[in-house]
């Protein structure tokens, strides 16, 4: 987004000095690309806190044209062994946060008579995954939320879509055993994992006018794993 000239506002949960330093480091990295970037500390799962953050962002930037809902955690476990706390934590961060931000940003976009909302889902939100019922449910919810918002806000020019990444090469997936990685690759026709840039490129398309007639859709970025 920044390389295409978009000004960036992003939020993250800050619980200690190290997290605050990470927030500032990311802000500087983005701003070095020649755009305005501001970082905001906040708990996306908190409804009132999110409203305050969005009001501040709107005051600082003057408009909110694109919203990417990308907050996410995992607390995996088989359903019968999963605690209520595990379920609630994942649904609150992964799904409720998206509702909170959409609820706060939608009035601004409606007044602007335009905007693009992008929900980060997952292929497990499409077909499920054993041991991840909470995560799968949250990501399926992101799809349903995007489709519903697309219908509600579409008449005023606001679009909403979901992106469903598959196996993406990240520091988290790099920690998986070689056996698990090989098993994943067998399921992917392209026989490789995706890169974070693959996801960013699809989000950039959905944010831009190139997708001005695309709304209520789920774009799977998974190398053909889920057809």
What are the residue ranges of the model-derived segments?
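Active-site helix of classical SDR
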Residues: 102, 138, 146
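Substrate-binding pocket helix/loop in short-chain dehydrogenase/reductase
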Residues: 78-79, 86-91, 184
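Alpha-helical segment proximal to the catalytic Tyr-Lys
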Residues: 107, 151-155, 212
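Short-chain dehydrogenase/reductase
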Residues: 1-61, 75, 85-86
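Residue(s) in the substrate-gating loop at a strand-loop-helix junction
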Residues: 122
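Active-site loop-to-helix junction immediately N-terminal to the catalytic Tyr of the SDR YXXXK motif
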Residues: 82, 128-136, 148, 176
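C-terminal helical subdomain
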Residues: 162, 185-210, 214, 221-223
